[in-house]
Every structure is written in structure tokens, then in C-alpha cells.
């Protein structure tokens, strides 16, 4: 199955890029998006409605767990719902699924929520935004500038605002 192979490759990539502390490839990382996996039965409105369907299979759940084993932490809410099917009119009945997540490494999440109000708007996506605030201080970057035997020290802290933390975003991986 393509989805399972893709998630396995992603977990291996995350592990490979982790590096050792102090190495250049040991950078903070955020993976976020629609994983189309409900990691637990509590992440769907009625597990009996999903028996023998995608999103809740043991193989999918193991693939999601592989991302955690690769060194990522779920930083987004682990309860509530982030998706409601339009066709079945699930939103007004709060019959949803939690399938959208942010996973991180090397960052401290200071808060998170699912923006259900955004989902309630006319013409909104069937997914609600998953918002996570991170406490992130960018490392000081130093280097020398060539010229006349002088060295210039440069300092950059572009991520002083937690919303500027480096991210990788994922799309729909159904």
C-alpha cells in the first residue's frame, strides 16, 4: 500500500536526519498535515462506523507510531476532532475524526488547539486548522566575512516570534 510505504520512508528519513546533538542536521523539525490516520479508537466519533475502513487499520496506526519511534512527538491536541465529512453532514452532529496532527522534534510546544470555529464557516474546508505554538529561540549564527584581515560577527534570530519557527508541512497522504 502506497500510504504505508510512504509513511515508513518518512520515518526512516526523520531518523536519518536526526543526527547527533551539535551536528548541523540536528535541527528542529515540524511535520504537520492530514495524516488520514486516527491513532486511537477515541479519535473517531464511533469506531463501529469505521470497522474495515481506512484511517483506523492496525497497519496505519503502526505506521503513525513509527513516526513517534523515529523521534517525533505529537504536539497537537490528541483529543477532539479535526475533520468532519461534508457529504454525511457530520459537523453539526460533531461526528468527526482526529486525523490532522503536528509532530515535532527539538521544539517545546507551549499550547495547541483545533480551530473548530474556522471549520464552522460557510464554504470552509472539511478539516479544521490545527494550531500549535512553539517556544523557539533560533541559534546564534556566527561567521567571518572576508576582507582586509577583519572578521565580522553576525547574529541572526529570525525566529524570535514562535510563528517563524522552521516547518515542513505535509499534504494529504491518503
Task: Describe each model-derived feature in a short phrase.
Residues 1-8, 48-53:
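Surface-exposed cleft-lining segments at the edges of enzyme active sites
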Residues 4-15, 64:
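Short, hydrophobic/amphipathic alpha-helical packing segments
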Residues 10, 14-43, 103, 126-127, ...:
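Active-site beta-strand/loop signature of hydrolases that rely on acidic residues for catalysis
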Residues 160-161:
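N-terminal, intrinsically disordered, basic low-complexity segments enriched in Arg/Pro/Ser/Thr
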Residues 164-165:
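Short hydrophobic alpha-helical segments enriched in small aliphatic residues
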